[in-house]
Amino acid sequence: MHLSAVLNALLVSVLAAVLWKHVRLREHAASLEEELAVGRRAADPAPALRIDYPKALQILTEGGTHMVCTGRTHTDRLCRFKWLCYSSEAEEFIFFHGNASVMLPSLGSRRFQPALLDLSTVEDHNTQYFNFVELPAAALRFMPKPVFVPDVALIANRFNPDNLMHVFHDDLLPLFYTLRQFPGLAREARLFFMEGWGEGAHFDLYKLLSPKQPLLRAQLKALGRLLCFSHAFVGLSKVTTWYQYGFVQPQGPKANILVSGNEIRQFAHFLMEKLNVSQAGGPLGEEYILVFSRTQNRLILNEAELLLALAQEFQMKTVTVSLEDHAFADVVRLVSNASMLVSMHGAQLVTALFLPRGAAVVELFPYAVNPDHYTPYKTLATLPGMDLQYIAWQNTMPENTVTHPERPWDQGGIAHLDRAEQARILQSREVPRHLCCRNPEWLFRIYQDTKVDIPSLIQTIRRVVKGHPGPRKQKWTVSLYPGKVREARCQASVQGASEARLSVSWQIPWNLKYLKVREVKYEVWLQEQGENTYVPYMLALQNHTFTENIKPFTTYLVWIRCIFNKTLLGPFADVLVCST
């Protein structure tokens, strides 16, 4: 009897534990489903999206998946899906073929060479590819019951969510503009991150982009074994990226940068509004120089001395900020009102995109690290329309560096290398150009601590910042280009058998009358028909008579374009055909 009671008690306790765990799992799944179904209630006054399950299932089983993509290659492709599905068990996407399926582009096996598209903005990286497996819609009868996601989904990969430079450059900026590439997407979309990382150190920043909570790949398993998206966009626009990290060739600016400071500043303004950060009046009530303080590695060993020297040189308050000790909104508040930002090379410098126009960015490099080889922040600061002053300073004195050869390899340690290689690295005066990401000499040098040589730093800054640093009270204007010249005409006259004159005239581009332009000139190309060469002319007036080398009874092709301020070249007008 006693034994029976013990067994009963044990059975009851085990059953209770199992039931408790089951209830907790159900509650977790239910909370995620509720988040998917009614996530817009808190942040969006519009009614929650609902799925008519029988109708959705019928559309999927009969019609199948629908895909239309833009872009010619996998590196610039974005795809729009209806009824794309995801197996949380296989961790693969599924394209179900039904009687209404569309797959554009229809690539066949080329879809695997190497992929349909890049899920992240890091171009052609073999860990970032997107593809799907194909099944007939009839296979749904033998598969787990689909769970339909009612939200419009934007599906992408974050590249490195623990590094602030990667977060901004690879993820936030591209997400921001991809969401605005399609009508309504910024208000409706839920972000699905499929790379497999946890939330990371900066997940709160991703939450600012959409009124709905982003979901990670690991969370999808709790929703169901087979998820189907009624409407999904897959991939990210790369148009806002300006830097490549050196996976194929040594790192540097992208060959064809398509973003300007205007787009960067529009994004920064959006983020500042979301963070409730104001640029109207500095938080300290006066102009100041902001110095980024690092607390773990790449330290400025004489930071206090540096602060004092900057204050004395520029007659301005100097303050420090760090990512470790300040909330990110406070970092942005300080940066967005600073006259000068000083920092060792590092991810925190991406916050320069919040600096006011006219401010200075001073990037410090450790010994043996050539500033010309590592330029993500220089490239950002010097984008047209950013209107920042950029200064790079490098420690050239080996006695002013403190190395850490005993640290783990990923923190710059070299103790794991053979002695000859250690000796070579210690004697090297410059890190050679290299590929990402585990070059031991690069890691050894970039994780050094530095005693800044104050006189050389001040001298370097003064080469660029001549007077008082900080925003200038001047009107910063976007560079606007001329349109085509209008009403081009030509008139010819022949004088004898060997001489001729060709008079050409035109009207100004119509947008010129609405612009304030310092200098307007016209470039005219004159080409004899049938010849491969042309003669260029730069003219200040809207008419000109050409006499040199003009032949009688000859046809000439004339191209004309307007140029503003010597550098803003407008388009050529339609070719003018003139006969003498």
From Swiss-Prot:
- Reactions accelerated catalytically: 3-O-(alpha-D-mannosyl)-L-threonyl-[protein] + UDP-N-acetyl-alpha-D-glucosamine = 3-O-(N-acetyl-beta-D-glucosaminyl-(1->4)-alpha-D-mannosyl)-L-threonyl-[protein] + UDP + H(+)
Question: Under the GO molecular function aspect, what terms does this record hold?
Answer: acetylglucosaminyltransferase activity; protein O-acetylglucosaminyltransferase activity
What the entry lists under SUPFAM superfamilies is as follows: Fibronectin type III (SSF49265)
Ranges in the topological domain labelled Cytoplasmic: 1-4
Q: How does it sit in the membrane?
A: Single-pass type II membrane protein
- Domain Fibronectin type-III, by residue range, is 488-580
Instruction: Specify the enzyme's EC class, one word.
Output: transferase
Task: State the Gene3D superfamilies in the record.
Answer: Immunoglobulins
Principal subcellular localization: endoplasmic reticulum
Q: Where in the cell is it found?
A: Endoplasmic reticulum membrane
> GO CC annotations?
endoplasmic reticulum; endoplasmic reticulum membrane
Transmembrane segments annotated in the record for this chain: 5-25
- Which Gene Ontology BP annotations are present? neuron migration; protein O-linked glycosylation; protein O-linked mannosylation
**Ranges per topology, Lumenal:** 26-580
Enzyme Commission number, as recorded: 2.4.1.312
Pathway membership, UniProt: Protein modification; protein glycosylation
- Sites carrying a glycan are 99, 276
Assigned protein family:
Belongs to the glycosyltransferase 61 family.
What does the record give as the function of this protein? O-linked mannose beta-1,4-N-acetylglucosaminyltransferase that transfers UDP-N-acetyl-D-glucosamine to the 4-position of the mannose to generate N-acetyl-D-glucosamine-beta-1,4-O-D-mannosylprotein. Involved in the biosynthesis of the phosphorylated O-mannosyl trisaccharide (N-acetylgalactosamine-beta-3-N-acetylglucosamine-beta-4-(phosphate-6-)mannose), a carbohydrate structure present in alpha-dystroglycan (DAG1), which is required for binding laminin G-like domain-containing extracellular proteins with high affinity.
Q: What is this protein called?
A: Protein O-linked-mannose beta-1,4-N-acetylglucosaminyltransferase 2
Report which gene this protein is encoded by: POMGNT2
